[in-house]
Amino acid sequence: MSRRYDSRTTIFSPEGRLYQVEYAMEAIGHAGTCLGILANDGVLLAAERRNIHKLLDEVFFSEKIYKLNEDMACSVAGITSDANVLTNELRLIAQRYLLQYQEPIPCEQLVTALCDIKQAYTQFGGKRPFGVSLLYIGWDKHYGFQLYQSDPSGNYGGWKATCIGNNSAAAVSMLKQDYKEGEMTLKSALALAIKVLNKTMDVSKLSAEKVEIATLTRENGKTVIRVLKQKEVEQLIKKHEEEEAKAEREKKEKEQKEKDK
């Protein structure tokens, strides 16, 4: 029945749905997991890398995380070629604003500008929506550290912690459970990101080569965007595994004591 309504982007189904937009969202559901967490002293992006070929030159290739300007970065989930077009557009919008007003573009304004383009692709015939969701992290003088998410329909929102991609529902419920508002430091946010990725990624054991993490902080009045080196990610994973093992031991000891009673 739906085939009559899903061949074109602009046709509504009898239930008032745009199937092509929903199919674009479906493409994101199969992409690698990306999550963002807002902390008091910074904000981070963590993403699952799927293309981990050992011959890949990582100097020229970033699968998941892209720097947009001095104050913003983004992570993508979905069709990578679509993501490249959108990240280039984001950089152009940011540079035009800087040239015109001699100051960096506010985070939300950049997100809104891109979402207007995304929305246009759901409204005009002969085009298809971009099969990409983005997480944006940034800092501006108006609202400080910020985290935004946008989807193929052009819809966007500000978040304290969120996830897109594969197993995002499970990741969001974990974040909801473990996110402590007002108490999150970047250090605890990194530990939480590793914990969530460990539970939601479709791998038996989490490895540093499959994870990409970027942090955004402020130092001496300037924004610093850092992509964590593989060794740093390895240390975070190792620390998480040690804590998991410790918690498991304590649980067993507690159960044993209860049995002895």
Curated annotation (Swiss-Prot):
Pfam families: Proteasome (PF00227), Proteasome_A_N (PF10584). It is found in: Cytoplasm; Nucleus. GO terms for cellular component: cytoplasm; cytosol; extracellular exosome; intracellular membrane-bounded organelle; nucleoplasm; nucleus; P-body; proteasome complex. The keyword Cytoplasm applies. Keywords: Acetylation, Cytoplasm, Host-virus interaction, Nucleus, Phosphoprotein, Proteasome. The modification N6-acetyllysine is found at K127, K176. SMART domains: Proteasome_A_N. The modification Phosphoserine is found at S13, S75, S173. InterPro entries: Ntn_hydrolases_N (IPR029055), Proteasome_alpha (IPR050115), Proteasome_alpha-type (IPR023332), Proteasome_asu_N (IPR000426), Proteasome_bsu_CS (IPR016050), Proteasome_sua/b (IPR001353). Residues 240-261 are annotated as: Disordered. Induction: Down-regulated by antioxidants BO-653 and probucol. One of its GO terms (biological process) is proteasome-mediated ubiquitin-dependent protein catabolic process. Component of the 20S core proteasome complex involved in the proteolytic degradation of most intracellular proteins. This complex plays numerous essential roles within the cell by associating with different regulatory particles. Associated with two 19S regulatory particles, forms the 26S proteasome and thus participates in the ATP-dependent degradation of ubiquitinated proteins. Belongs to the peptidase T1A family. The 26S proteasome consists of a 20S proteasome core and two 19S regulatory subunits. The 20S proteasome core is a barrel-shaped complex made of 28 subunits that are arranged in four stacked rings. The two outer rings are each formed by seven alpha subunits, and the two inner rings are formed by seven beta subunits. The proteolytic activity is exerted by three beta-subunits PSMB5, PSMB6 and PSMB7. (Microbial infection) Interaction with HTLV-1 TAX protein favors NFKB1 activation. This is Proteasome subunit alpha type-4. It comes from Homo sapiens (Human).
